[in-house]
């Protein structure tokens, strides 16, 4: 078997698992309906108001809710039944499209109603996105997770190839009401697939997280993960500049290229078709380039496409350029998504992917508004040229900030012993102070502190909100590491969160310990008493 055939088989291997295959097909249908709706709304706003600011507001209305709500949605995806949660949200999205159908059929549609209902659709997307990504490990075996992530991206772009073109044709032939009606029907398939799925619900866990605690834990993890910071920064700069093409494409189609609704759909369909092609050749690209090279290639190609469009080329040239844009877009998106997935443990995946989605959509929202305002001031062609130059500049400038490899073993190690207590401790009691006492030779002190600094990031990622190290004034070789956890339950969760990679870091720290026994660990609980103030 050739390497290409092996790569292809690996790409589609997750579809051999029935539940994943059914939900994957259903999401393609649902996303196709969403793209049909978005094409109708984006084009209708150019009929109602042709100003760049109004057109870019549609893009902003779709992405702003994800920026605002993705993190709370990620928390919900980690603490609720994901299947039931998705079903409720699909009904919300269907209701928004029903309202668009009614307003269009009755002739009451306006820029305000389009933006408002697009915002509601964005709320639904914000609630769905981290949940769909978080359920992937439930649907496939561990070796197939990366392939399933890539297939999710491929599925979205199959929808992007079909939906916009179909939406443009439906809008041109039958009008907005029928177009929105097709979107409503698409949700029926998604809801049916979710109802059919018999998800294995985890048993009730006495340590199950509550919303606010889970929210804080997710933010603590994101704040302490340096690898995630690199992914977020690389994503932010790429999407902030590349968002110009999405914010201004309706105006490019209508004003620069002289096309109608069906041509706009063809342009978006070209993006999707290019993305499908890009997804199919990505295994070969990955064999030749690392993640940083793929992201730089995406930036160069996207900038080139914006440069071509700024010259108002012939329509066929624009279609060809957007085929390239689609391939570049899925390359960047899949590279960043798979990197984020690879560095996140299961317990915090939904929440932390939501942080990534927040940055992604924040960059898209802010970029869309900024490029819309810029186009109002200097025109669409010059704005595209400025965005292209900016994307090239940041692409090369940030290339030296290498993306993480995602090779750490994040499976829970379960190597921490149960804490010793004189009697059972109530789960909500806290805060908890944990002390670990080491005996360190003077010659090893510097290397020990370096290893301990690496361990501090693991402590904070897994739940600590304060961390430090102290020494005994009478015995400088006696060092005490301490960290604070907000409750006893949260500390018990730490025991479950520590990964095998974290265990390796802890082993590196403990090899400097020279005591006759293992480092002594003590747990101190806060005392709440009226005389203590």
Across the structure, where does each feature detected by a protein language model lie?
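Helix-loop boundary and gating motifs at the non-cytosolic
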Residues: 7-64, 220, 224-270
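Short hydrophobic/alpha-helical segments at membrane-entry points of transmembrane helices
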Residues: 23, 109-117, 230-231, 316-322
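Transmembrane alpha-helix termini and helix-breaking/packing motifs in multi-pass membrane transporters
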Residues: 42-49, 101-106, 162-182, 251, ...
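Loop-to-transmembrane helix entry/capping segments in MFS-fold secondary transporters
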Residues: 52-53, 142-152, 261-262, 346-355
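C-terminal transmembrane bundle of multi-pass solute transporters/carriers
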Residues: 58, 68-72, 79, 83-85, ...
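Cytoplasmic helix-loop-helix junction between adjacent transmembrane helices
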Residues: 117-158
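Helix-loop junctions on the cytosolic side of multi-pass membrane transporters
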Residues: 134, 138, 180-210, 288, ...
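An amphipathic, aromatic/His-enriched active-site/gating alpha helix that lines ligand/cofactor pockets
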Residues: 404-406, 457-466, 484-521
């Amino acid at each position: 078997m050739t390497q290409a055939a092996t790569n292809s088989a690996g790409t589609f291997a997750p579809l051999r698992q029935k539940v994943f295959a059914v939900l994957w097909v259903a999401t393609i249908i649902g996303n196709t309906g969403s793209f049909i709706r978005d094409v109708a709304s984006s084009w209708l706003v150019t009929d109602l108001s042709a100003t760049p600011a109004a057109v870019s507001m549609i893009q902003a209305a779709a992405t702003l809710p994800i920026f605002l709500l993705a993190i709370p949605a990620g928390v919900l995806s980690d603490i609720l039944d994901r299947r039931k949660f998705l079903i409720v949200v699909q009904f919300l999205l269907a209701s928004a499209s029903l309202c668009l159908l009614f307003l269009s059929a009755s002739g009451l549609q306006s820029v305000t109603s389009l933006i408002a209902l697009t915002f509601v659709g964005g709320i639904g997307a914000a609630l769905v996105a981290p949940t769909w990504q978080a359920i992937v490990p439930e649907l496939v075996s561990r070796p197939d997770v990366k392939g399933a992530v890539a297939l999710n991206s491929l599925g979205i772009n199959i929808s992007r190839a079909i939906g916009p073109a179909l939406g443009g044709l439906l809008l041109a032939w039958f009008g907005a009401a029928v177009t929105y009606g097709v979107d409503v029907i698409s949700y029926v398939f998604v809801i049916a697939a979710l109802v059919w799925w018999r998800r294995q619900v985890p048993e009730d866990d006495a340590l199950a997280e509550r919303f606010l605690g889970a929210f804080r834990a997710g933010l603590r993890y994101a704040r302490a993960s340096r690898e995630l910071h690199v992914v977020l920064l690389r994503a932010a700069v790429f999407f902030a500049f590349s968002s110009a093409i999405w914010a201004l494409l309706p105006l490019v189609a209508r004003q620069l290229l002289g096309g109608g609704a069906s041509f706009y759909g063809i342009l978006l369909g070209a993006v999707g078709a290019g993305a499908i092609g890009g997804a199919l050749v990505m295994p070969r690209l990955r064999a030749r380039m690392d993640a940083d090279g793929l992201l730089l290639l995406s930036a160069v190609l996207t900038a080139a496409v914006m440069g071509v469009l700024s010259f108002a080329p012939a329509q066929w040239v624009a279609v060809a350029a957007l085929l390239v844009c689609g391939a570049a877009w899925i390359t960047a998106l899949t590279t960043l998504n798979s990197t984020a997935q690879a560095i996140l443990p299961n317990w915090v995946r939904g929440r932390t992917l939501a942080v990534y989605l927040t940055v992604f959509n924040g960059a898209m929202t802010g970029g869309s508004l900024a490029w819309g305002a810029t186009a109002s001031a200097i025109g669409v062609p010059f704005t595209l040229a400025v965005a292209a130059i900016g994307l090239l500049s940041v692409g090369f400038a940030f290339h030296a900030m290498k993306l993480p490899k995602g090779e750490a073993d994040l499976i829970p190690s379960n190597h921490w012993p149960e804490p010793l207590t004189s009697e059972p401790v109530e789960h909500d009691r806290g805060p908890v102070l944990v002390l670990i006492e080491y005996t360190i030779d003077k010659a090893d002190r510097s290397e020990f502190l370096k290893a301990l600094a690496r361990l501090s990031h693991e402590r904070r990622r897994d739940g600590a909100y304060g961390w430090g190290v102290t020494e005994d004034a009478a015995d400088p070789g006696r060092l005490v590491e301490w960290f604070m956890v907000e409750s006893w339950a949260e500390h018990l969760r730490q025991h479950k969160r520590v990964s095998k990679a974290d265990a390796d870091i802890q082993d590196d720290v403990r090899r400097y310990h020279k005591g006759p026994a293992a480092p002594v660990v003590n747990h101190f609980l806060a005392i709440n008493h009226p005389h203590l103030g």
